[in-house]
């Protein structure tokens, strides 16, 4: 490691604490309270407290430390992570049928994220604001309005970017974790007996004593590890080493101390179960703690919102969601983006959730199903990568998968008990997103196949035009083409109706590669097809936004001079009608038509000046 890297490591690690660990770092606000609140039939008693603490600690070790930080984070695509990245990696060296199954798993995992993300900001901010019940019980009626006000301000600042306030995230979250550790240590010193719960036998004893009830209670324990998937998704921003270093040096010790501190408090004062986190603090510290807790939950919510923006952009670029307006809020950091439609849809959903559920305890009942479902899918996809891409021994990989599923499946099954009490919400939202993504992908493929099934050979058409050219007019024409070897619809219709062709014709294809970024050296490939025809293929990664002006600049560097304001861009505009279909495919077709009508137009996607665009319409039956 270079000196520069050594000097920057503390800064990167601090930044990772500020962004990556917001969700899991605010879990102590509500996790132990939900475990011991009485909903599972046992109260605050020694065996239950020790059992839950042991389960929480060893889940943090096994799921976060071993599974995600040690194993899953090995699977990266040019340093990037996330469930869709894992899906892409897993499908590289498998058969077509297996790849299809892996794609479905990846899309379900991505859809689950959309379902869970509606709950995370609501439960985080509400659990912090609920500290008012301890500070000033008469203000408890203000919890819902204040939660909505805080989140409204958060969603409103998204369009301005978070670069400025983002600099404060790291020191605030570091302060938060130090407070977690300090409060917990203070309580543990007063009752060190609680440290016996570090022994995993207490978790075993918990299952043996409480039997079926203990299994159902796993639905509350899982609240302690929500946010684990974010570690993998944010790997590209901070790097594996920084995320691991932050976890083992700051986050894990702080969480452990705080959970065990809450346990020590409950052993001495069972009545503290109404809010064990805030009751850890002395009276004089309650208001400052309430403020820092609110800030920490806002930061956790911001991390989730940014994650939704990133996942949406990746899904759009990979062709699973319709094109939509994506705004870059930072000239320095390509990952800082703002998607207005997603932002305000998420805001409306979060407000509805807060008003409907009214208390974080009610929201906890809806939390966990999507998280644990994603955990199961991550285990399957990551072990597939280990076998197919890393060529690990199949028996060793099978043992790893069995070990992961022995934890993931019980957690997921236990959370199914929440289905009627709120778990239906993330599942419903996830199902809607899965239908939307699969509909857009499959119907888009159907449309392209329909448009080009009777197409002639591109090479034959160019040869014919060069041999018997139509009237040529001065200038350059660019025809956008979705596929490399097919004749653009706009070109055929221009020849059919206008019977003219520009002196120079460029067939431009913008391609998304299976990588987050494409090096500038490989950005543009130029091929001269004839004296007057050129093919330009511009490649972009799924974390990049295509820009035609940049493509023209690259073409100029390679000898094909193009000027944006002297070029005409011909594009086809399809008017779609539904053909004869079974009723269920007809419903899917209607959904696709709705998505198509609201999709961002190509000139806006690629930042082409509107006065240089000529759209030629055609009717296509799908």
Curated annotation (Swiss-Prot):
Record's subcellular location: Cell inner membrane
Chain segments annotated as transmembrane: 9-29, 49-69, 103-123, 137-157, 165-185, 213-233, 247-267, 276-296, 337-357, 363-383, 396-416, 419-439
Keyword Transport applies: yes
Positions of disulphide bridges: none
One annotated GO molecular function: potassium ion transmembrane transporter activity
Membrane-topology descriptor: Multi-pass membrane protein
Keywords: Cell inner membrane, Cell membrane, Ion transport, Membrane, Potassium, Potassium transport, Symport, Transmembrane, Transmembrane helix, Transport
InterPro entries found in the cross-reference section: K+_transporter, K_trans_C, K_trans_N, Kup
Keyword Protein transport found: no
Catalytic activity line of the entry: K(+)(in) + H(+)(in) = K(+)(out) + H(+)(out)
A GO-annotated cellular component: plasma membrane
PANTHER family: LOW AFFINITY POTASSIUM TRANSPORT SYSTEM PROTEIN KUP, OSMOTIC STRESS POTASSIUM TRANSPORTER
Family per record: Belongs to the HAK/KUP transporter (TC 2.A.72) family.
HAMAP family linked: Kup
Known role: Responsible for the low-affinity transport of potassium into the cell. Likely operates as a K(+):H(+) symporter.
Name of the protein this chain belongs to: Low affinity potassium transport system protein Kup
